[in-house]
Amino acid sequence: MKADYITRESLLPPYLAYPRFLLGMNVRLIAREVYIILLDMAYSGTDVRIDSHGRRYLTFYNKTIAEIIDRTPSTVAQTLRELEDAGLIEKKLISRSAPYHVYVKLPDGEDV
């Protein structure tokens, strides 16, 4: 990768938002990475749905996230459990043949 200096004319490349509250959370780095990707998907992704309460949720297979972060689907499953235990996501099983509905949550008082 070729790198260049930042100047006044430099534009910010595509990026993912890293919420400050994650800095103080006791979760692994990969969990933070997956949460950031899910948060980005929840705000700008094509797999976003809205439930009857007006809450956004994602529908995806672990393989989708695994390909983004270059890890295995089982690593993603473990990471999603960690995020759920931390209260940052909520998973709802709709049926065995469909992907989970994953709600990405923000701590009370936090906005993106």
Predicted regions and their residues:
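Winged helix-turn-helix DNA-binding recognition segment
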Residues: 42-106
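Residue-level signal for threonine
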Residues: 19, 106-107
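Short recognition helix of helix-turn-helix/winged-helix DNA-binding domains
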Residues: 1-63
